[in-house]
A protein has these predicted regions:
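Hydrophobic/aromatic-lined pockets within catalytic cores
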Residues: 23-28, 40-51, 213, 217-218
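Extracellular ligand-binding/catalytic regions of CAZymes and related secreted enzymes
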Residues: 49, 146-225
Length: 225
């Protein structure tokens, strides 16, 4: 209320819209885990009360699913929101509860691109291997059926029909979404000790994060005429 919002949900929507405007204006957004789908859900539900009473003090709107506007999202479409407040899930975007993959077989593959024709995805997928260990998160990976057709899949588990690492454009800017929480802590939970990065100097999963950290510094060379 000190910031001028009646409810926390309104404040969170305002933050999501600020990020949206930053990207549309030419900025770059990198998000992981639940920062990916929750961001798109917030944008899609602008003007619609989807929060139950225990979260914001009043009931959600009746039939709110039918009022979701997928045209407002960055990456996802045709997803269903999870209504139950006791279910640890936001929507049908996330594959965590749908996947049946043991840790020993949990990997995703990076798509190979041409540096000449696709410089941006080539930079974002640079790695010493094309096979990357999977890892869990509140949002582990994305159901391919909910990924918009104009969004580029950079990494996927094709057998399981899940996208793990995606990239797209919005306005003058770009975004990258990466499912999962910590590439070197398979089931990192709240309260767990932090991962010692020095122990994983050649982590393929961390390399993808680094690619996105360094990406905004990459400048296009002027073409000779």
């Amino acid at each position: 209320k000190e910031l001028g919002f009646a409810k926390v949900s309104e404040e969170k929507l305002a933050v999501a819209k600020k990020i949206r405007d930053f990207v549309i204006g030419g900025g770059f957004m990198f998000a992981m885990c639940s920062a990916t789908d929750s961001f798109d859900i917030a944008l899609s539900a602008e003007g619609v009360d989807i929060a139950e009473a225990m979260f914001d003090g009043d009931a959600s709107e009746p039939n709110y699913q039918s009022k979701i506007n997928y045209n407002k999202t960055f990456a996802f479409t045709d997803f269903d929101l999870v209504r139950s407040p006791i279910t640890y899930e936001f929507s049908s975007i996330d594959m965590t509860s749908k996947r049946n993959i043991p840790k020993t077989a949990d990997y995703f593959s990076l798509i190979e691109f041409s540096a000449k024709w696709d410089p941006v995805p080539t930079m974002l997928t640079q790695n010493h291997t094309t096979l990357v260990k999977g890892f869990m998160g509140q949002t582990t990976s994305f159901d391919r059926e909910t990924v918009k057709t104009n969004v580029l899949v950079l990494g996927e588990n094709k057998t399981n029909r899940e996208a793990r690492y995606i990239h797209g454009t919005k306005g003058k800017g770009m975004f990258t979404f990466y499912g999962g929480h910590d590439p070197e802590d398979y089931t990192h939970r709240v309260g767990d000790p932090k991962t010692e990065l020095d122990l994983h100097p050649t982590s393929p999963g961390y390399r993808l994060i680094l690619n996105n950290v360094l990406f905004p510094a990459a400048k296009k060379k002027k073409q000779k005429t």
